[in-house]
């Protein structure tokens, strides 16, 4: 699913809202999540999951074309951890023993 499909589905489920307004709402939600992550904050959508950023330290890598060794600088990468309800919907009938993680 792409963003425009999400907007269409949400607009169809909410006929009292204009398509343009739904698009603005979806964009606003995504912008807020992006801004929070850029500020180093965690975004939790209870039952769905949590977005956060993790540091990927610098390392030595290889250029796949030449095989030469290259230095890869450290960077921050987005990370998503699924929530319990989402995992249960994706795996119906499976017993989730929480895998040592708190949700």
Curated annotation (Swiss-Prot):
Quaternary state and interactors: Heterodimer of an alpha and a beta chain.
One Gene Ontology biological process: DNA recombination
Xref: CDD domains: IHF_B
Function of the protein: This protein is one of the two subunits of integration host factor, a specific DNA-binding protein that functions in genetic recombination as well as in transcriptional and translational control.
Similarity comment text for this entry: Belongs to the bacterial histone-like protein family.
Classification of source organism: Bacteria, Pseudomonadati, Pseudomonadota, Alphaproteobacteria, Hyphomicrobiales
Molecular function per GO: DNA binding; structural constituent of chromatin
Keyword Transcription assigned: yes
Annotated organism of origin: Rhizobium meliloti (strain 1021)
UniProt keyword terms in alphabetical order: DNA recombination, DNA-binding, Transcription, Transcription regulation, Translation regulation
InterPro entries, per database record: Hist_DNA-bd, Histone-like_DNA-bd_CS, IHF-like_DNA-bd_dom_sf, IHF_beta
Gene Ontology annotations for the cellular component aspect, listed alphabetically: chromosome; cytosol
Protein name, entry field: Integration host factor subunit beta
Pfam families in alphabetical order: Bac_DNA_binding
């Amino acid at each position: 699913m792409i963003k425009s499909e999400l907007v269409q589905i949400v607009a169809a489920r909410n006929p009292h809202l204009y398509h343009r307004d739904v698009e603005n709402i979806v964009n606003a939600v995504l912008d807020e999540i992006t801004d929070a992550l850029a500020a180093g904050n965690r975004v939790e959508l209870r039952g769905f999951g949590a977005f956060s950023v993790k540091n990927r330290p610098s390392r030595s890598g290889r250029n796949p074309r030449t095989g030469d060794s290259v230095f890869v600088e450290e960077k921050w990468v987005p990370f998503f951890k699924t929530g319990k309800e989402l995992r249960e919907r994706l795996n119906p009938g499976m017993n989730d023993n929480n895998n040592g993680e708190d949700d």
